[in-house]
Swiss-Prot record:
Belongs to the SmpB family. Its main location: cytoplasm. This is SsrA-binding protein. InterPro entries: SmpB (IPR023620), SsrA-bd_prot (IPR000037), SsrA-bd_prot_CS (IPR020081). It comes from the Bacteria. It comes from Shewanella frigidimarina (strain NCIMB 400). NCBIfam families: PRK05422.1, smpB. Transmembrane segments: none annotated.
Length: 162
């Protein structure tokens, strides 16, 4: 008998680790993606890179640019596979208007944080609304992260000695 996968076993497809280092994320939004067939197949194989990706709003629609989806070798020959094709994000009009206002007036940036499967069949993108960090902010975050690691190491050593 075939064993079923749990719902959370492979829900995550890709994460943008640079986004949390480069930006201070204040809000997160879930959006759908308008994809082609070969892109879905490549995503199922895990050939996605979100590192140089960003979201922009143009004429009342949201688009994700810079997301690299590598085509499979077995992709169809009659379809032109562009790995860095701009993908349309599926958001409600009210969400797009709210985000556009924040971007234009308050200097926020939209950055994709992660890509994951919703209900096993739909690809969703988690978009972070944030502001860019300065160099000193990045250094503080690095020091804080290193301090947490060092503190955990010391605590573990104390438990072993006790």
């Amino acid at each position: 008998m075939v064993k079923k996968k749990s719902a959370n076993a492979s829900a995550s497809i890709a994460r943008n680790k640079r986004a949390t280092f480069e930006y201070r994320i204040e809000d997160k939004i879930e959006a759908g993606l308008q994809l082609m067939g070969w892109e879905v197949k490549s995503i199922r194989m895990g050939k996605v890179n979100l590192s140089d990706c960003y979201v922009y709003i143009k004429e009342g629609e949201a688009f994700m640019h810079g997301c690299t989806i590598q085509p499979l070798n077995t992709a169809s020959t009659h379809v032109i596979c562009d790995p860095i094709r701009t993908k349309k994000l599926l958001l409600k009009r009210s969400e797009i208007d709210k985000l556009a206002g924040l971007i234009e007036r308050q200097g926020y940036t939209l950055v994709p944080l992660s890509m994951y499967w919703r209900k096993g069949a739909w690809v969703k993108v988690e978009i972070g609304l944030g502001k860019g960090k300065k160099d000193h902010d990045k250094r503080e975050d690095t020091k804080e992260r290193e301090w947490k690691i060092e503190k955990a190491r010391v605590m573990k050593k104390d438990k072993e000695n006790a």
